[in-house]
Swiss-Prot record:
Subunit-level organization: Monomer.
EC number: 3.6.5.3
Family stated for the protein in its record: Belongs to the TRAFAC class translation factor GTPase superfamily. Classic translation factor GTPase family. EF-Tu/EF-1A subfamily.
Enzymatic class: hydrolase
Region annotation G4: where it falls in the sequence: 136-139
Name the UniProt record assigns to this protein: Elongation factor Tu 1
HAMAP family: EF_Tu_B
Gene: tuf1
Gene3D superfamilies, sorted: P-loop containing nucleotide triphosphate hydrolases (3.40.50.300), Translation factors (2.40.30.10)
Localization, UniProt: Cytoplasm
PROSITE patterns in alphabetical order: G_TR_1, G_TR_2
UniProt keywords, alphabetically: Cytoplasm, Elongation factor, GTP-binding, Hydrolase, Magnesium, Metal-binding, Nucleotide-binding, Protein biosynthesis
Length: 396
């Protein structure tokens, strides 16, 4: 049989299931795959295939995740589901599976539980922009008032973490009934409603190429008679010959102009998101630029030394530290292409951080780095990774 050609004609959106253990995330993931395949075509993965999440490495950290894909009438979705709570924490902090929106699964029989809260907090910290809710196991609750109570609790919890709790879509259903092909209101119709809500509630994500130009600098060369060339992979946007650009981070921000773009020794008119290229800078001296800075569209990103972060500390089994660290700990923070030393302050009431924990902290770097909320980094000690983090807030 001929292999189906992957068609890129629908917008691509990344989503995932979050929520407390045993509330039905994996069953719902399997039900979505099954119902989507039945309704909109495509191939369904069964529960066992999703549950046996393969290991993958992200920034040197082992994470178990399942990836499935499905289509609706208007979109193509990539959906991530994690088996264990620790996998969620690692996944969200490292950004291994970036989510344009999340489906929070809450069991109607339990209501919100500790990990429900923690996953909402994590979503807020790492910048998941939209959360919608699937209230699962509704077939096991006879009392309509109980369902309303759970819904109210979920809305309040979302509002506590600055999500629009009152306006969040909440779909009531039973993932198991839907998976078994039942067509009562909690079965397949509930999952079809969920798919329609995904299409309407999560806006189409902005593509990297449409964002402002940004290129982390990896290397700097001087070419006699032509000037200084910096190389790197364009992270977002487009740079054209003649564009004004800024060099941001580590030192004072400098303005310069792109006088040439080259790729594989060929001269081009522009460099685009995803491409590795060299950018020729007008009037910039070799010693004025260094690895760890970024080239950016003027005014689009600013340098900061202080920020708040959500951090996952590797366990010793993952090659991390064997001992906890305390307030004032000074490791290296690896942003994009370079290490910068920084000092950490833990939140009041937190004395120390154990390997394997995730924690909120404030950091002060010795040099400013071009950063925005959502930027990922690694924490290193003597060249080995001991933690992974994400900028939750920039200060100054």
């Amino acid at each position: 049989m001929a292999k189906a050609k992957f068609e890129r004609n629908k917008p691509h959106v990344n989503v995932g299931t979050i929520g407390h253990v045993d509330h039905g995330k994996t069953t719902l993931t399997a039900a979505i795959a099954t119902v989507a395949a039945k309704t909109f075509g495509g191939e369904a993965k069964d529960y066992a295939a999703i549950d046996s999440a393969p290991e993958e490495k992200a920034r040197g950290i082992t994470i178990n995740t399942s990836h499935i894909e499905y289509d609706t009438a208007d979109r193509h979705y990539a959906h991530v589901d994690c088996p264990g709570h620790a996998d969620y924490v690692k996944n969200m902090i490292t950004g291994a599976a970036q989510m344009d929106g999340a489906i929070l699964v809450v069991s109607a029989t339990d209501g919100p539980m500790p990990q429900t809260r923690e996953h909402i907090l994590l979503s807020r910290q790492v910048g998941v922009p939209y959360i919608m809710v699937f209230m699962n196991k509704c077939d096991m609750v006879d009392d309509e008032e109980l369902l309303e109570l759970v819904e109210m609790e979920v809305r309040e919890l979302l509002s506590d973490y600055d999500f629009p709790g009152d306006d969040t879509p909440i779909i009531k259903g039973s993932a198991l009934e839907a998976l078994n092909g039942k067509d009562g209101k909690y079965g397949e119709p509930a999952v079809i409603e969920l798919l329609q809500t995904l299409d309407t509630y999560i806006p189409e994500p902005e593509r990297d190429i449409d964002k402002p130009f940004l290129m982390p600098i990896e290397d700097v060369f001087s070419i006699s008679g032509r000037g200084t060339v910096v190389t790197g992979r364009v992270e977002s946007g487009i740079v054209k010959v003649g564009d004004e650009i800024e060099i941001v981070g580590i030192r004072d921000t400098q303005k310069t102009t792109c006088t040439g773009v080259e790729m594989f020794r060929k001269l081009l008119d522009e460099g685009r998101a995803g491409e590795n290229c060299g950018v020729l800078l007008r009037g910039t001296k070799r010693e004025d630029v260094q690895r760890g800075q970024v080239l950016a569209k003027p005014g689009s990103i600013t340098p900061h030394t202080k920020f708040d972060a959500e951090v996952y500390v590797l366990s010793k089994e993952e090659g991390g530290r064997h001992t906890p660290f305390l307030n004032g700990y000074r490791p290296q923070f690896y942003f994009r292409t370079t290490d910068v030393t920084g000092a950490i302050s833990l939140q009041e009431g937190t004395e120390m951080v154990m390997p394997g924990d995730n924690v909120e902290m404030s950091v002060e770097l010795i040099h400013p780095i071009a950063m925005d909320k959502g930027l990922r980094f690694a924490i290193r000690e003597g060249g080995r990774t001991v933690g992974a983090g994400v900028v939750a807030n920039v200060k100054d």
